[in-house]
């Protein structure tokens, strides 16, 4: 998606540890016009597929999923990372390992909101090692629902999660795939051009 790639080139920052900072438009401050275009593009990528619900994980996936859901005209269900009193005790659970935190945690969805044979589309902001996507898939499997696929805004192709999950026959549509990155360069899979970061953005 060219508009998304241009935004990444112009304002994203790459920090140590393969951290891509897109908090100015995607996961802290939100660029709503851009998110609308992302929603339209995800709808186009899954055109013709029957989707009953969109599933994502809190927190960063919620805004993207909610805006995309307008174009699919379906509800959004988000997996919660904490066990709280206002979450039903009867839940589906997936396990996610966080490489940044160095620990595993559970994500949960009430059984009220995912049902057998429903067609579920997963939407999330990032795909790196694939742990979050795998945890969300576990929840879909437990619900005996049908996984339509996953719509991802940014995939770090060099971290291998997308390759592994595609090899397991999961359909993944990533709007921007980064195959190489460092503090001065980003290389997108579909153009393989060295894209020098704007020094003003750092």
Curated annotation (Swiss-Prot):
Xanthine binds at residues 20, 27, 156. It catalyses: XMP + diphosphate = xanthine + 5-phospho-alpha-D-ribose 1-diphosphate. Its main location: cytoplasm. 5-phospho-alpha-D-ribose 1-diphosphate binds at residues 128-132. It holds the Pfam family Pribosyltran. It comes from the Bacteria. It is found in: Cytoplasm. PANTHER family: HYPOXANTHINE/GUANINE PHOSPHORIBOSYLTRANSFERASE, XANTHINE PHOSPHORIBOSYLTRANSFERASE. Belongs to the purine/pyrimidine phosphoribosyltransferase family. Xpt subfamily. NCBIfam families: PRK09219.1, XPRTase. This is Xanthine phosphoribosyltransferase. The gene is xpt.
